[in-house]
């Protein structure tokens, strides 16, 4: 089965073709990062317009790369949510229009299920069951995974997501958008002993997260230093180091608890923040101590992409899922509401 995947949930236009026999055979991505950088964040209307401009050329590109015609595909999978409603509509309407033209099914896919299963595209994918840490700009969740559509939410952020906290900390430190990679890069030069930031919600039982207080602590620290004069480059680096260590430590503590609570030995880490080198280093050490193993997507599949959508669509269709009767665009869509494929 050959499935075209379309991802347009936010600020990246991703298109890919996944073959259930050959694996990923074509993949293309257009990032809107430079366009949104001057505004310090994603502008929804601009995102939708850019998806409209870029989506069809990317579809043509992956078809050419795979040496296929549209009518040689077996299905189209598209991100139906969660995400920006206008951006979702671009992908959904394009998918349904092409599916009708090529007389093939179109299936809406949950964006976070795509991230959750992105490590399945790697050469050594994890077996079920596993614990998953989904950590991105919009989500921070721990999920117990027993199969496709068999998910149990263990914990989630009660306020800001980890990726959102990184972006806000970057603004406080006058770093460019998107903030996460810039904070991590700056943190490498920071003194780990100068500041110690709190590890929110780690002093009590449970698997929920909170990052808003950490954001406030970062702002307070920066303002205290500014009272004596402008922040130096070393001040910024030291704050970035303390912030990153606090976020990473919090995520590691909660993952450790989740593995202990479930008794599972496999940990999947996915979403944009999963690319953070310090987080991977700490989680690799933590899982090794427990005779467990951590799994990650390759770098380009940590962020939004069409490959993960094509993969999930293919798996659901193979398992008997039927195509959408109507176009779907669902800005808010809890992952825990998903169910196994039903024929």
From Swiss-Prot:
The family this protein is said to belong to: Belongs to the KAE1 / TsaD family.
UniProt keywords, alphabetically: Acyltransferase, Cytoplasm, Iron, Metal-binding, Transferase, tRNA processing
Designated name of the protein: tRNA N6-adenosine threonylcarbamoyltransferase
Native species: Chromohalobacter salexigens (strain ATCC BAA-138 / DSM 3043 / CIP 106854 / NCIMB 13768 / 1H11)
Function: Required for the formation of a threonylcarbamoyl group on adenosine at position 37 (t(6)A37) in tRNAs that read codons beginning with adenine. Is involved in the transfer of the threonylcarbamoyl moiety of threonylcarbamoyl-AMP (TC-AMP) to the N6 group of A37, together with TsaE and TsaB. TsaD likely plays a direct catalytic role in this reaction.
Alphabetical GO biological process terms: tRNA threonylcarbamoyladenosine modification
Enzyme Commission number(s) from the entry: 2.3.1.234
Catalysed reactions, as listed in the record: L-threonylcarbamoyladenylate + adenosine(37) in tRNA = N(6)-L-threonylcarbamoyladenosine(37) in tRNA + AMP + H(+)
């Amino acid at each position: 089965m050959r499935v075209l995947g379309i991802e347009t949930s936010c600020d990246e236009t991703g298109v890919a073709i996944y073959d259930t026999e050959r694996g990923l055979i074509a993949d293309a991505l257009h990032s809107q990062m430079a366009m949104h950088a001057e505004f310090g964040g994603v502008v929804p209307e601009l995102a939708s317009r850019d998806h409209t401009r870029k989506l069809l050329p990317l579809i043509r590109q992956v078809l050419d790369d795979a040496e296929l015609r549209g009518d040689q595909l077996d299905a189209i999978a598209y991100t139906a949510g969660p995400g920006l409603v206008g951006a979702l509509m671009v992908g959904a309407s394009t998918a349904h229009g092409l599916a009708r033209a090529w007389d093939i099914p179109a299936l809406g896919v949950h964006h976070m299920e795509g991230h959750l299963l992105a490590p399945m595209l790697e050469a050594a994918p994890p077996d079920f069951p596993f614990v998953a840490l989904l950590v991105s700009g919009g989500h921070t969740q721990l999920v117990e995974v027993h199969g496709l559509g068999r998910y149990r939410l263990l914990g989630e952020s009660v306020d800001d997501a980890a990726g959102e906290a990184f972006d806000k900390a970057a603004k406080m430190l006058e770093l460019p958008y998107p903030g996460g990679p810039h904070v991590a890069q700056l943190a490498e030069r920071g003194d780990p002993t100068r500041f110690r930031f709190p590890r929110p919600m780690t002093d009590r039982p449970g698997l929920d997260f909170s990052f808003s207080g950490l954001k406030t602590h970062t702002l307070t620290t920066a303002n205290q230093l500014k009272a004596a004069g402008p922040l130096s480059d070393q001040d910024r680096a030291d704050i970035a180091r303390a912030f990153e260590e606090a976020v990473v430590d919090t995520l590691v503590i909660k993952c450790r608890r989740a593995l202990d609570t479930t008794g599972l030995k496999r940990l999947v880490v996915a979403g944009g923040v999963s690319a953070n080198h310090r987080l991977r280093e700490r989680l690799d050490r933590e899982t090794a101590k427990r005779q467990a193993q951590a799994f990650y997507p390759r770098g380009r599949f940590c962020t939004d992409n069409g490959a993960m959508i094509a993969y999930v669509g293919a798996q659901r269709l193979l398992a008997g899922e039927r195509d959408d009767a109507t176009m779907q665009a669902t800005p808010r869509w809890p992952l825990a509401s998903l169910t196994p494929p039903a024929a």
